[in-house]
Amino acid sequence: MTDADAQLKSNALQRLQGWFANPTIGAVGASAQRSGGVQQEQVHRNMFELLREGESAHDSTPFLEGSLMMWRSSGFHSSQLNTGSNADDAQIATQVRLNGLRSIHDSETQFQDVAPTTHEGQRRQKIRRAQGLQRLLLRHRKHWRSSRIGDFSLILRREAHFHLTAPLLMR
């Protein structure tokens, strides 16, 4: 899956595809290199990209960049997508893991896209993304303490803290 405005490096698709030689990998996503964004966004992206890398090394990440990601057709069925909610990339990554395969972030594979040019445009984009991630985490709250998915339940709990609890504490 790619976004129309994403500019891919020449080997990006082949590199992502190479991960599927490992039969445990069900989804893999690339790293965004944004132009035109505000400095604060880059700091935020760097921090959360480190989380994606750590989650991927430990088990799986529930959130991938939909601008450039791949998944095994056997790892996810379109009927599992909530079309009434946004953050479809995170829905796919999370569901692939819940279906038994790993979902990982490849920081070495990058794509370039352009951030909204106004602060208001960037704010709207961030709010829409955050709402989608919050809805996803709430929909899967029964998995926050599931022994069936092992360490991924801890990752979901941590993400729930970052996206649901921490924003409430900042008010």
Pin down the residues of each PLM region.
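Acidic active-site catalytic centers that drive phospho-/nucleotidyl reactions
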Residues: D3-D5, D88-D89
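Residue-level signature of catalytic and energy-coupling elements of molecular machines
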Residues: D5, L51, V96
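Short aromatic/basic micro-patch
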Residues: Q7, M70, D113
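General alpha-helical segment detector with a strong preference for membrane-spanning helices
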Residues: Q7-K9, A93
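Catalytic donor/gating beta->alpha subdomain of glycosyltransferases that bind UDP-sugars
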Residues: F20-F48, T83-H161
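Short amphipathic alpha-helical segments with coiled-coil-like heptad repeat character
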Residues: A57-T61, Q134-R135, L169-R171
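Core segments of transmembrane alpha-helices
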Residues: E159-R171
